[in-house]
Amino acid sequence: MSSTLGKDKDSKEREPKAEGKSKTKGKDAKDGKKDTSGASPAVAFTLDSTIKRPNPPPSTRKKSSNAEVIKELNKCREENSMRLDLSKRSIHLLPSSIKELTQLTELYLYSNKLQSLPPEVGCLSGLVTLALSENSLTSLPDSLDNLKKLRMLDLRHNKLREIPAVVYRVSSLTTLYLRFNRITTVEKDIKNLSKLTMLSIRENKIKQLPAEIGELCNLITLDVAHNQLEHLPKEIGNCTQITNLDLQHNDLLDLPETIGNLASINRLGLRYNRLSAIPRSLAKCRELEELNLENNNISVLPEGLLSSLVNLTSLTLARNCFQSYPVGGPSQFSTIYSLNMEHNRINKIPFGIFSRAKVLSKLNMKDNQLTSLPLDFGTWTSMVELNLATNQLTKIPEDICGLVSLEMLTLSNNLLKKLPYGIGNLRKLRELDLEENKLESLPNEIAYLKDLQKLVLTNNQLTTLPRGIGHLTNLTYLGLGENLLQHLPEEIGTLENLEDLYLNDNPNLHSLPFELALCSKLSIMSIENCPLSHLPPQIVAGGPSFIIQFLKMQGPYRAMV
């Protein structure tokens, strides 16, 4: 019986802030591809400033009648307000009297039901910000080209099948959001928007960019993620001011050599494409800090590429075809903070490859073909998160004791039969995952891991636990399911912070110690498929609180009831 009091978190994207004071919340578009990276995936970044956050509470704003909207317009005119926010009013039609608000510089119409705008909006000649996200717009009035001062136009989450022709004529624009529409093409007239510093056209159906994109010489951020691009025009190299370029989730087969002209770029997202090679010219992008090549068809990098990228701190090569580490020696990792090589075919970490990696804190080697670790393994003293899951490791070297900064260690799905005594030296360890190995016992030294909060030992061959387990008083999660445990030590009662305890599928576990009643914070206890004959079925059905109460009543702790 398992009683779960877990907390499911609904999440929603936070959309980027518009210029001025506006905020808008958008809807996340699922890409259908699961990211299973273990140790802190490096740089699945989103240049549209999108991050996952819990759903906000439902809006309490009442649906507006046309009369109420007109009242708002009148109030704005009387107060001579320069900012008008009519977001989330369920507006179907914007009154033509909007034309009277010529003093406006900011107009926010997020999350309404607009299918069109009245041409009178073109009378608002002082507008700097026009926010129209989350409506049902299919077009825009030609009168918008009267907005000679407009700098920010937000058209995210509408039903546009093309970029309205009038948009290309608003040459004052510096920020243009077109995310999550149904746009298939970008016209040559994009060159007219030469003042753009931010262009987001992610999550559309665009198959190619015109050569004229290269005339946007002021672009700093270009986000074309989640489209259908197979190639980039070589003219992209003319956009030399770009610092953020997001091309993830396209169908890119190659990159132009001119990519090396982007001397200011510091973030380059290329994950989930069809690249088989990276141009050598990328070595000239010396300001690059984050490079994400996850889920492509790359087997080698140009020799010396990483050594040339002297500011690179985050590198993701996960889900490619690498059979060995990139050629370039130890110097190529001297600035790297996070390295993700998950899901490749690497069978060896070269000796000394991290001898200059003094800031390397996160290494993910999950799902490779490692059978052993290098002899200098113990010198990785800066390592904080280490993921070696799903390999073929049969033992961990004793000099693991040198990894004194380690906080998260994942060794699940290997062939380990025992742990080294040196494990006890990892005093900062907070999470230790040993699921699905062949462990028959744990060393007593595990008692020294007093900061440990999560210990996963599921699916091993453990018959007992060391009594020192009771010293892990910060433990909140203990997974012991699918083992051969015959009993639990009474010291388990000292785990005063334990919240989740999994004991399921231990066929030799016939009883629970009365001391378990002292674990007052237990909210999840899984005991399925354990022959616990001393627990009445109705007690088991009641969940952790009933079981704890029963153990108190039956044992020496009844005075605590």
From Swiss-Prot:
- Reply yes or no: does the keyword Protein transport apply: no
Spell out the Basic and acidic residues composition-biased ranges. 1-36
- Region entry Disordered: which residue ranges? 1-67
A Gene Ontology BP annotation from the UniProt entry: cyclic-GMP-AMP transmembrane import across plasma membrane
* Positions annotated as LRR repeat: 80-101, 103-124, 126-148, 149-170, 172-193, 195-216, 218-239, 241-262, 264-286, 287-308, 311-332, 335-356, 359-379, 382-403, 405-427, 428-449, 451-473, 474-495, 497-519, 521-542
Which Gene Ontology cellular component terms are annotated? Answer: cytoplasm; nucleus; protein phosphatase type 1 complex
Kindly give the SMART domains that the UniProt entry links to this protein.
Answer: LRR_BAC, LRR_SD22, LRR_TYP
Q: Which GO terms describe its molecular function?
A: protein phosphatase binding; volume-sensitive anion channel activity
Report the superkingdom from the record: Eukaryota
* Family stated for the protein in its record: Belongs to the SHOC2 family.
Role, per record: Core component of the SHOC2-MRAS-PP1c (SMP) holophosphatase complex that regulates activation of the MAPK pathway. Acts as a scaffolding protein in the SMP complex. The SMP complex specifically dephosphorylates the inhibitory phosphorylation Raf kinases, stimulating their kinase activities. The SMP complex enhances the dephosphorylation activity and substrate specificity of PP1c.
According to UniProt, the name of this protein is Leucine-rich repeat protein SHOC-2
- Source organism phylogeny: Eukaryota, Metazoa, Chordata, Craniata, Vertebrata
